[in-house]
C-alpha cells in the first residue's frame, strides 16, 4: 500500500514538473524559426499563426510561433479593419510536442474582404490614450467595435490606442491576453456590437 501511494505521489510530482516547451519566433514571410521556450503553467499548447497587414494595394505578411492556451485553439481566424484603409487578418493553428515539427505552415486564404454594411468608430493613436475618431466600414464577419488601449509598448510607443471593426474571435483572443509571450505590456480591451450607419 505504501509503495502504491509513493508511486502515485511520484507520478504527480513528475507531471507537475513536465513543462511544455514551444518554439518562439516572429519573422517576415510565411515561415519563422526560433529557440525553444518553457511555457507558463497555464499555457498548455503551442500556436503558430500567419498575419497579413493590408493597406491596398500593399500588404505585409509575417509568421509567429509562441506558447498559448488550448481554450483559444478554436479561434483560428481573426480580423480587424481600421482607419486609413488599414486591415489586419490572421490564421492560427495549435499543436503540441512532435506534432509541431510535422504541422504544415498556416496559410491565409485569399478572400474578397467585402463590406458588410456595418460601421464602428475608428482611430489609431501613438503616445496617447485618445485619438480623433472617424467612421470605419466593417468587412466580412466583423461584427464588433474594438477599443484597445495599450501601455508600456516600448518597441512602438509608451502608449497606443486602436479603435475599429473586429471579429468576435479577435476580441476573445485579446481579452485572454495571449500576447504575453511577446512582451510585458498592458492591454485594456473592450468590444461592443457594431451599428448600421443609418443609426448615426
UniProtKB/Swiss-Prot annotation:
Function according to Swiss-Prot or TrEMBL: Inhibits the enzymatic activity of phospholipase A2 (PA2).
One example GO MF annotation: phospholipase A2 inhibitor activity
Name of the protein in question: Phospholipase A2 inhibitor gamma subunit B
Signal peptide segment: 1-19
The organism of origin for this protein: Gloydius brevicaudus siniticus (Chinese mamushi)
Residues of this chain annotated as glycosylated in UniProt: 33
UniProt keywords, alphabetically: Disulfide bond, Glycoprotein, Phospholipase A2 inhibitor, Secreted, Signal
Superkingdom of source: Eukaryota
GO annotations of cellular component type: extracellular region
Family classification: Belongs to the CNF-like-inhibitor family.
UniProt note on tissues of expression: Expressed by the liver.
Amino acid at each position: 500500500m505504501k509503495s502504491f501511494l509513493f508511486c502515485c505521489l511520484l507520478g504527480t510530482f513528475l507531471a507537475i514538473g513536465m513543462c511544455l516547451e514551444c518554439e518562439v519566433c516572429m519573422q517576415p514571410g510565411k515561415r519563422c524559426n526560433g529557440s525553444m521556450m518553457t511555457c507558463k503553467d497555464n499555457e498548455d499548447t503551442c500556436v503558430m499563426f500567419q498575419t497579413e497587414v493590408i493597406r491596398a494595394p500593399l500588404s505585409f505578411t509575417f509568421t509567429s510561433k509562441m506558447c498559448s492556451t488550448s481554450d483559444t485553439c478554436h479561434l483560428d481566424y481573426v480580423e480587424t479593419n481600421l482607419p486609413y484603409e488599414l486591415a489586419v487578418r490572421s490564421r492560427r493553428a495549435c499543436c503540441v510536442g512532435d506534432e509541431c515539427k510535422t504541422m504544415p505552415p498556416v496559410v491565409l486564404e485569399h478572400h474578397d474582404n467585402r463590406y458588410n454594411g456595418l460601421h464602428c468608430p475608428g482611430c489609431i493613436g501613438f503616445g496617447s490614450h485618445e485619438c480623433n475618431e472617424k467612421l470605419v466600414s466593417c468587412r466580412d464577419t466583423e461584427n464588433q467595435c474594438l477599443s484597445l488601449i495599450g501601455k508600456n509598448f516600448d518597441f512602438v510607443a509608451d502608449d497606443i490606442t486602436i479603435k475599429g471593426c473586429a471579429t468576435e474571435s479577435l476580441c476573445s483572443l485579446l481579452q485572454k491576453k495571449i500576447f504575453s509571450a511577446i512582451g510585458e505590456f498592458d492591454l485594456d480591451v473592450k468590444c461592443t456590437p457594431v451599428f448600421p450607419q443609418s443609426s448615426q
